[in-house]
Amino acid sequence: MESYIQNLFAERIGGKKFGKEDVIYKFEKIKRAKQEAMKRHPDMELIDMGVGEPDEMADPEVIRVLCEEAKKWENRGYADNGIQELKDAVPPYMEKVYGVKDIDPVNEVIHSIGSKPALAYITSAFINPGDVCLMTVPGYPVTATHTKWYGGEVYNLPLLEENDFLPDLESIPEDIKKRAKILYLNYPNNPTGAQATKKFYKEVVDFAFENEVIVVQDAAYGALVYDGKPLSFLSVKDAKEVGVEIHSFSKAFNMTGWRLAFLVGNELIIKAFATVKDNFDSGQFIPIQKAGIYCLQHPEITERVRQKYERRLRKMVKILNEVGFKARMPGGTFYLYVKSPTKANGIEFKTAEDFSQYLIKEKLISTVPWDDAGHYLRLAACFVAKDENGNPTTEEKYEDMVLEEFKRRLEGMDLEFE
């Protein structure tokens, strides 16, 4: 007999059909394919370039600060909307790394338990039924999901190679612009690796004023750039009048599981965010915030991380070009974004997802496919390399061993592209 609870689920998560849908989503397919492939080839190591998670632990000094602060009686309690010391550390960091000045640490900065809830809370603060959120695709879906949950609509802006993977704001219909409230951006961009330009950000500011929308720029990979200095949306004149930027510690400081981020920018948006946040969480553990302060005071940690990814990405580009792909260095992030072949070894593939499944099952190479705006594969440079004892390591000779095997498996596939 079916439980009455099955009839009580909210429509936003599927209503009465919750848990009964037989649709298997992309990442679940990847997970299942990896498990199947490893069973079929028990003596073959999986090369996982799909996971977008740093392969290293946080810097030893950051861990030391966490441990020391966790022992202090005064750090045991609720943090609510964050400790002021963390907020005070943000303006010097933004000026040193991004050249952004005049940030008010009291009213223009707030912390978040990672960037995912930050995106959810902002949506909660602004979206009513019928409102529109402008979303770039492919991309991180959290803002879109929550927009729909609140009865809003999502208007997708495809990121195309011919436009340097920047959205075409002029293509948005007038009726959509009239109902739009949020423009979500993510640069450096996941998955394309594209970096925005000052010219583009100026266009965004003008667009926001003209159409009265707020800008949410997700800078999760902000400092991981390979062509020039990191660029903040807030470095553009009047950007602070229309939006906020979200900075995560996950990618820049190898702290994915620590769950720490901060928002910086428009005072009204920060105030609304704080109101929503007050009703959802009680703040991140204070010792983690203290460790975050150390990070912001030591941006050279990110520079070491960035150098490792640049080294790996350049090697991956070389290998991919040698075996038949057309790869180039990204502007930022730790991803390569390459066109997916339509044929390999005489086998035809209609989508990037089809080819990605083939790579996992036949070559034990995991990637993430994207078919939202063309057919592409995302390959991450945060793959795990192991030493002779099977322990994770970042020594270059061991990452070279992974990449040599990566190349060996890809060679001779007779790739064809449209």
From Swiss-Prot:
EC number(s) per entry: 2.6.1.83
PROSITE patterns: AA_TRANSFER_CLASS_1 (PS00105)
Keyword match Cytoplasm: yes
Modified positions (N6-(pyridoxal phosphate)lysine) in chain numbering: K251
Gene Ontology cellular component annotations, sorted alphabetically: cytoplasm
Temperature dependence: Optimum temperature is 70 degrees Celsius. No activity is detected at temperatures below 45 degrees Celsius. At 85 degrees Celsius, the activity is 85% of the maximum activity.
Record has Cell division as a keyword: no
Cofactor(s) in the UniProt record: pyridoxal 5'-phosphate
UniProt subunit comment: Homodimer.
PANTHER family with a match to the protein in the record: AMINO ACID AMINOTRANSFERASE, L-GLUTAMINE--4-(METHYLSULFANYL)-2-OXOBUTANOATE AMINOTRANSFERASE
Family membership: Belongs to the class-I pyridoxal-phosphate-dependent aminotransferase family.
Protein name, as recorded: LL-diaminopimelate aminotransferase
